[in-house]
Each structure stands twice: as structure tokens, then as C-alpha cells.
Amino acid sequence: MNTPDIAQVKRFLLNLQDEICQKLEQADGAARFAEDSWQRPGGGGGRSRVLRQGRVFEQAGVNFSHVHGDEMPASATAHRPELAGRSFEALGVSLVIHPENPYIPTSHANVRFFIAEKPGADPVWWFGGGFDLTPFYGFTEDAVHWHQTAFDLCLPFGAEVYPRYKKWCDDYFHLKHRNEQRGIGGLFFDDLNAHGFDQSFRFMQAVGRGFCDAYLPIVERRKALTWGERERDFQLYRRGRYVEFNLVWDRGTLFGLQTGGRTESILMSMPPLVRWEYDYQPREDSPEAALYRDFIVVKEWL
């Protein structure tokens, strides 16, 4: 079947949210997700889940949303002007994980489906998503594992898929005002529809299911490492870059706010604690300097 099946996508996304939350609870070993179901006045709603003050995760949020409306927001029509005048539905699962231990990276993943329709015209639809990793202290084996998992899940869909979406991720998660990468990248894709609904949906499923395979082994490797005030201060400083990107550059944040989405859920990606420091410079040859020099730069990890 190559006509879009919104109900099938929704079933997958709800199950994916359940699976990821269960695996994160197992990895944390103490805290549980609290669920908050909500309705959007303009149409649709969602299921927000947040885990706080766990043994491993300071905060983890895993959101499902399914929103619809009669008119496209400016953030979408600017990107695709042919969508003006169409009604829309947008479904997705989005997650951000902020560990307490600075040696465990922050991670983000998102998978989504979008369809816009108007009478007398074919629907315009696509899939998007990806996952990316933001370490504070870099470990080459973690970066290689992260990218190897991404490569492996892409390979059944074509040898060109990983390099294309790896580059797109590097380009997207770039803080232009700092001329810095947000992290070590991963995968980012959008506007995916060229191979038909079934094939595009299969790829989105592979990315959604691949996230835990990419992230949780890193959590297990790093969660027992001891850390102190120095590492925590640097983690909180680097979290500031996460905030800057999400509020200034992220298309998903802008889309959510412009469509009247639920602000608490949209800003769930924000770290619970963060700090800024004027003109911070890491000490030369320190682990902090190595992050800038060796990790948050565009490079081939495989």
C-alpha cells in the first residue's frame, strides 16, 4: 500500500513511546515516567511523559503528539510555500534526555509524519526525524558506536542513505551564531516521500527503534564514572548551547509554538539546570578543550 495510512503511523508512534519509556526506566533503575495527557484547543492533543531526578537521568522527556488544523503555520509555509491554504495533520514522538552524570551525553531523537490536504488536490505528505548526541566529555568509542548504529540501520535502505543524513544532521545542528556544532551529530532527515509511503514509513520505524540501540550502551558504559564540581560546571555551561539552539534555530520548536502547541511539552527539551559564563575558554590540553577540538567538529567517525 502506498497511500498514506495515518492510523498505522499513530499506532507505531504510541507503541514506540511505550517501548522507549520502558527501556529508559530500566536503564535508570529508580525513577518512573509521569504521564500528562493533553488536548490542543485548535485540534488534536498528545501524551507527554517526563522522568525527573532519577538515579541516572536528571530529566528525560518522551512526547507523543498528534495535532491538526485548518491552516498551515508560517514556519511550514516558508519552508514549503505549496502548503499554503491546506489543512494539516502532524504526528510525532520527540524525546530529549539530560543525564545527571556529565560523562553521559545528552541525547535527542524525533520521528514524525506530516500530511497536508485540500479538496481537489493530492495530499502532500512526508516523514522526518533522526537522532543526535551531545557529549560533554568525549569518548571515541562512544562516538563510533553511535554512528555505527546509525550506519547499520540505514544500510538496508541504500549505501548512500547514511552519508546523506549524517551530513544533513551536521548541517542542521550547527549553532550559526557560535560557529559551533551542537554535538557529534547522527542522522537527520526530512521531506521523505520519494520512495512511496511503505518504504518511507519503514525507514522512519528503523530510526525510531534504533535510538535505544545507539544510546543505551553508552549510558551503561559511562554511568558508573565518578564526577565532581568541575565536570558538573562544564556540563551546565555546555547545556546552554542546547538551550540556545532550541530557542533560536530549531524548526520543530518554532512549528510547535506557531501552531498553538502545548508550551510545556514543546519546552520539555530544556535542561532543568543550565548556566552561562562570559567568554569561557577551556584550559589548553584539558578534557574540556578536547571536546571542542576532537568531538564537536564535523568529521567522519567510521
From Swiss-Prot:
Keyword Transferase included in the entry's annotation: no
GO MF, any single term: coproporphyrinogen oxidase activity
Family membership: Belongs to the aerobic coproporphyrinogen-III oxidase family.
One Pfam family hit: Coprogen_oxidas
Protein purpose: Involved in the heme biosynthesis. Catalyzes the aerobic oxidative decarboxylation of propionate groups of rings A and B of coproporphyrinogen-III to yield the vinyl groups in protoporphyrinogen-IX.
Protein's recorded name: Oxygen-dependent coproporphyrinogen-III oxidase
Gene name tied to this protein: hemF
Catalytic activity: coproporphyrinogen III + O2 + 2 H(+) = protoporphyrinogen IX + 2 CO2 + 2 H2O
